[in-house]
């Protein structure tokens, strides 16, 4: 009797699933184990330390928020992701709501500016409508919105300077997230929102910092990155040549959150790949350090971190070998679209800082 009931329930379930697929299309509902692609594809951030902290990189088909103070590296990080996408043959779009995109700097970071789609909308509604249409097209692999704070509602732009419009931007973002979120998963497009910080007034306990645009983006984002400048890089009499950035993974739905990554950003050049390689190679014991001396395969290669980076830049074959050894030890073999594996997640879970 029990087996008959189970058989009847299975038939009823299969009939319901078939009806749902006829009504809403193939793939509208499925058993999780039957999914054709179980693992989330990712896009490199340009910083190997951050890729590791994210479990492979920025996830495709998701919303990502990057926020932090001014001049902390938000746009640089996003442009590196754009460059990685283009190098893999993907299509990239940049919604420049701040009207501040620098083509020369973008090109220096590896962005193909001739094929980069750029929009400079006049108001927030236009910007988010452009994003929605690009996502629906399923032909774009990555979209960067710079920034949420510059997505000013049309009513606020057309109104007087003294008019009050409480919560208008938050309502705009909430509606946009509802429209965009469903389409992103089907298109496989990565949408990156850059955001600014504001100070809450009268906060006694906890951080007074808050991101603009309300709470909708916080909930819909699969990954939230908090990027800060922790050090200014100086070299003798040459003065400042870059910054040391620290990124905290404040939220991550596809890998363990709350990890921390650090990397160098060189003015005019972007994220220092060699700096990330040296840091991780030392951590993985591919390169050893005794005092100020760095050694590889038992031979001293340079004295001091800057000289070690210079040595790798002058010896690209050795640098490529070290980079490959580091990626193999950390289960990050694919340079452009690394895929998180179960083994890699377990290995990475042992350490929180990179």
Swiss-Prot record:
One of its GO terms (biological process) is DNA recombination. Keywords: ATP-binding, Cytoplasm, DNA recombination, DNA-binding, Nucleotide-binding. The keyword GTP-binding does not apply. The keyword DNA-binding applies. One of its GO terms (cellular component) is cytoplasm. It holds the Pfam family RecA. This bacterium is considerably more resistant to UV and gamma irradiation than E.coli; the E.coli-like SOS regulon model is not an appropriate model for DNA repair in this cyanobacterium. This is Protein RecA. It comes from Synechocystis sp. (strain ATCC 27184 / PCC 6803 / Kazusa). The gene is recA.
């Amino acid at each position: 009797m029990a087996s008959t009931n189970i058989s009847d329930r299975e038939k009823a379930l299969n009939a319901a699933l078939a009806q749902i697929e006829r009504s809403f299309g193939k793939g509208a509902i499925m058993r999780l184990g039957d999914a054709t692609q179980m693992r989330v594809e990712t896009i490199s951030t340009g910083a190997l330390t951050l890729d590791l902290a994210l479990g492979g990189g920025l996830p495709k088909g998701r919303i990502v928020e990057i926020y932090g103070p001014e001049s902390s590296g938000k746009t640089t990080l996003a442009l590196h992701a754009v460059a990685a996408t283009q190098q893999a043959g993907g299509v990239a779009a940049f919604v420049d709501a701040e009207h501040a995109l620098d083509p020369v700097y973008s090109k220096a970071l590896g962005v193909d500016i001739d094929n980069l789609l750029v929009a400079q909308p006049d108001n927030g509604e236009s910007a988010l409508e452009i994003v929605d249409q690009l996502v629906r097209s399923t032909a774009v692999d990555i979209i960067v919105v710079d920034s949420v704070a510059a997505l000013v509602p049309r009513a606020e732009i057309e109104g007087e300077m003294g008019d009050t419009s409480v919560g208008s931007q938050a309502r705009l973002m909430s509606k946009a997230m509802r429209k965009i979120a469903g389409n992103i998963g089907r298109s496989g497009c990565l949408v990156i929102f850059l955001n600014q910080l504001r100070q809450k007034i009268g906060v006694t306990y906890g951080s007074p910092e808050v991101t603009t645009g309300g709470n909708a983006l916080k909930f819909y984002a699969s990954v939230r990155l908090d990027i800060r400048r922790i050090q200014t890089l100086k070299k003798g009499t040459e003065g400042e040549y870059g910054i040391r950035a620290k990124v905290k993974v404040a939220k991550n739905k596809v890998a363990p959150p709350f990890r921390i990554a650090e990397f160098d950003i060189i003015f005019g050049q972007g994220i220092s790949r060699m700096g990330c390689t040296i840091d991780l190679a030392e951590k993985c014991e591919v390169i050893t350090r005794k005092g100020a001396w760095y050694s590889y395969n038992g031979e001293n290669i340079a004295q001091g971190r800057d000289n070690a980076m210079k040595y790798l830049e002058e010896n690209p074959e050795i640098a490529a070998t070290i980079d490959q050894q580091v990626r193999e030890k950390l289960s990050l073999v694919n340079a452009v679209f690394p895929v998180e594996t179960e083994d890699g997640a377990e290995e990475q879970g042992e350490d929180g800082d990179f």
